[in-house]
UniProtKB/Swiss-Prot annotation:
GO terms for molecular function: 4 iron, 4 sulfur cluster binding; epoxyqueuosine reductase activity; metal ion binding. Binds 2 [4Fe-4S] clusters per monomer. It comes from the Bacteria. Residues 187-216 form the 4Fe-4S ferredoxin-type domain. This is Epoxyqueuosine reductase. Pathway: tRNA modification; tRNA-queuosine biosynthesis. One of its GO terms (cellular component) is cytoplasm. It is found in: Cytoplasm. Coiled coil: none annotated. [4Fe-4S] cluster 1 binds at residues 196, 199, 202, 256. GO terms for biological process: queuosine biosynthetic process; tRNA modification.
């Protein structure tokens, strides 16, 4: 049996063996975060993410979500691919300047992080049980009403940046978070000081100005929300601002000075899959549903489905068409779009029609 004072360092060691980069411990009193959460919901900043409102304050009350919870273990797992080069932020910005290249958010180019983290959090829980005996617990990673970023902040994983993501002096923000709710009391780890200062680069760079104030994001304007969570037509006013981003957006992270310290993952799971990096928009637009399912198997992109995939690419093709001054390129882009002009999906047809009109 491991005594409680020795347990957290032991957990940190076991976690490193499983590919986690940092472990923290938080208490369960998140009442100070409740007013901000309710105000954000009241302003409608969650958009169509109705599950955010449905669970209300339960998100800020771990012991209501999982009765008996008295401590929360937070876990950080870095996700930059193992082959990430020096100066990777500049490389990604350069790719954004190539209008016909499809841009998928870095985190989504590899294996679905839900599967990776959940399995390893459970292994960590099993390892703890071997040392202390059976205990009540439940593991989470972006999959339940959990205030992940707030728990991470309180447990010393980092501070909340003005883009609302958690920032670490040692790892920037290019990491996933996971939690273990447990019925065992552990000493909390200390929070860290914020280090954004007067910098607001993330606010300035956001293509759609979704960061409406420091620490305040209107999801309805966020490209990640629009390309992933939003099911219907993308607001026409926002389409030209999306550029060639077809799944997610990393701009607020790419510009952040702290991400020069972002760490490559120790796991192969997050290495980029060839079809999702450096591909041309027209190539991906040609995928039928069977090809889409095959190419996205085991990854996070599959969850949006083929229809939204085509919707997103149609917008990007329209932006590429508007940007080109080459008649040959314009003809090829129009030809690619024309293949879906009579698509079975009204959603796809509408976005294709918009895209074709960008070349007029």
């Amino acid at each position: 049996m491991v005594c409680s004072s020795q347990l957290v360092p032991r957990i940190q060691g076991w976690a490193r063996e499983l590919g986690f980069s940092q472990i923290g411990v938080a208490g369960v009193d998140l009442s100070a975060a409740e007013p901000g959460l309710m105000q954000w919901l009241a302003e409608g900043f969650h958009g169509e993410m109705h599950y955010m409102a449905a669970h209300g304050l339960r998100r800020a009350r771990p012991a209501e979500l999982v009765p008996g919870t008295v401590s929360v273990i937070t876990a950080r797992m870095d996700y930059l691919p193992r082959t990430t080069p020096e100066g990777w932020q500049a490389v990604e910005f350069e790719r954004l300047r190539r209008p016909q290249e499809a841009i998928v958010s870095v985190y989504a180019r590899g294996r679905d992080y839900h599967k990776v983290l959940r399995a390893r959090l459970q292994k960590l829980s099993d390892r703890i049980a071997e040392a202390v005996g059976p205990f009540g617990h439940r593991v989470f990673t972006d999959s339940a009403p959990v205030l992940e970023a707030e728990l991470a902040r309180r447990s010393g994983q980092g501070w909340r940046g003005k883009h609302t993501l958690v920032l670490s002096r040692e790892a920037g923000s290019m990491f996933f978070l996971g939690e273990i709710y447990l019925d065992m009391a552990l000493a909390p780890t200390e929070p860290v000081t914020a280090h954004c200062g007067s910098c607001q680069a993330c606010m300035d760079v956001c293509p759609t100005q979704a960061i409406v104030a420091p620490h305040r994001v209107d999801a309805r304007r966020c490209i990640s929300y629009l390309t992933i969570e939003h099911a219907g037509p993308i607001p026409p006013a926002l389409r030209p601002l999306m550029g060639n981003r077809i799944y997610g957006c990393d701009d607020c992270q790419l510009i952040c000075p702290w991400n020069k310290f972002a760490q490559p993952s120790s796991l192969p799971d997050f290495d980029a899959r060839a079809p999702l990096e450096g591909q041309q928009l027209a190539q991906l637009f040609a995928w039928d549903e069977a090809m889409f399912l095959r190419m996205t198997e085991g990854g996070p992109i599959r969850r949006i489905g083929h229809e939204r995939w085509l919707r997103n690419i149609a917008v990007a093709l329209g932006n590429a068409l508007r940007a080109t001054r080459d008649a040959g390129e314009a003809g090829a882009l129009r030809a690619a779009l024309a293949t879906r002009a009579n698509d079975a999906s009204a959603l796809v047809r509408e976005h294709v029609a918009w895209a074709l009109a960008q070349g007029i």
